Amino acid sequence: MLLISSETKNAVRDLLMELIRIPSVRGHEGPAARYLCDRLLPLTDRCELIAIDDAIMQDPDYAFPIPGHSYRDTPNLECVVGGNGRGRSVVFNTHLDVVPPSEGQAHAFDPIEESGTIWGRGACDAKGQVATLYALILLLRERRVRPPGDLTFHFVVEEENGGNGTLAMIRRGVRADAAVVLEPSEMCIIPAVRGAVWFDLKVFGRAAHSGNVAGRISALDK
């Protein structure tokens, strides 16, 4: 059984609550990435913000382009804990962006701790996973453990609308022997997913007056 000190638990909790306070919806992930970079820089062998070129929006696998969108202040974050050269490399991936609050959720970015559970926008998807990786990095440093292979940590933008942040890292040529993607899964290991295909569908009908529908063609029926 792995025992975690109260100091480490408190550090992880504080990081999670601070991340929840940062409203990192699409296009506004920069402050969260910079905050996390500052926290991880002294704990890793390399930690840097990776700028995303706006040219990524021309990639055939890019999802949901928005006219006028820019990545000027939405970098990915990459951190590395170097291995001892005796094992395989692993990339850990999770995301910093969150779904915008629903109507009426006035305090979505105000974290609440209740009976050992932290509530707030992104606590489950996926800032809790960010905190989990932070805990892993803290424990490696505390116990002076050098992993067999390099551990690379990607904290990406724009997962919620198709995975554009991860796409940008892949296009940089990032490679490893294995990848672990952290998402809410009820503690189940999911070795594969069905994926997704985005497409636009146009169906044409023929309009008609409600008093004379004999010649109309319903696009919905087609």
Describe these PLM feature segments:
Residues 112, 197-202:
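Oligomerization/assembly interface segments of phage tail-like spikes and tubes
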Residues 117-131, 209:
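Glycine/serine-rich anion-binding loops at beta->alpha junctions
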Residues 95, 209-210:
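Histidine-centered active-site/metal-ligand motif
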Residues 210-222:
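Acidic-enriched catalytic cores of C-N bond-cleaving enzymes acting on peptides and small amides
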Residues 126-198:
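Acidic/histidine-rich catalytic neighborhood of metal-dependent amide-processing enzymes
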Residues 1-118:
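Acidic/His- and Gly-rich active-site-bordering loop/insert found
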